[in-house]
Design a protein with these regions (language model features):
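Phosphate- and other anionic-substrate recognition elements at nucleic-acid/protein interfaces
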Residues: 1-166
Length: 166
């Protein structure tokens, strides 16, 4: 059994989702999911500290063995890119320094992995997450659903890598 943490990084909201899978990539359990929200009135350093503190709590509580993190994609606003990059850096460092295996996936890879189509829209992705994980509702906020998609992508990626290596 392998425990996977998927993370959708952001400065305002960081989505996270924890899944257990077997060595064949079969989802055994949706362990938990949620989000870390930061106050926009806080300074950048305070927001990053809040993200790290809460992420450490998630890591300590659920003890994942591997982590998948969404990579940055194109933003029209340069300030948004910078702040999300800072959050990603804090997240990557926290996971890596905790001894975890960390993999990064583009939005295209995540969509392709889950729907078979790299240009799937948000609604298609959310319905797939709900269906694959047998959830009653789509997790909210969207960042949480996105984090579960990252975890599913990581499970599919590790299974594909295992098949190639055998």
């Amino acid at each position: 059994m392998v425990r996977i943490l998927g993370i959708d990084p952001g400065t305002a909201i960081v989505g996270w989702g924890v899944l257990d899978c077997d060595e064949h990539g079969n989802i055994q359990k949706v362990v938990s999911y949620g989000h870390i929200a930061t106050d926009k009135e806080l300074s950048t350093c305070e927001r990053l500290d809040e993200i790290v503190t809460n992420l450490l709590e998630v890591l300590d509580t659920y003890k994942p063995q591997e982590v998948g993190v969404e990579e940055l994609f194109y933003f029209k606003n340069a300030k948004t890119v910078i702040s999300v990059a800072q959050a990603r850096g804090a997240i990557l460092h926290t996971c890596f320094s905790g001894g975890l295996t960390v993999a990064e996936y583009t939005p295209l890879q995540i969509k392709q992995s889950l729907t078979g189509y790299g240009r799937a829209d948000k609604e298609q992705m959310q319905e797939m997450i709900k269906s694959v994980l047998k959830l009653n509702n789509v997790p909210k906020p969207d960042d949480t659903a996105d984090a579960l998609a990252v975890a599913l992508c990581h499970i599919n990626s590790r299974l594909y890598t295992k098949k190639i290596n055998n």
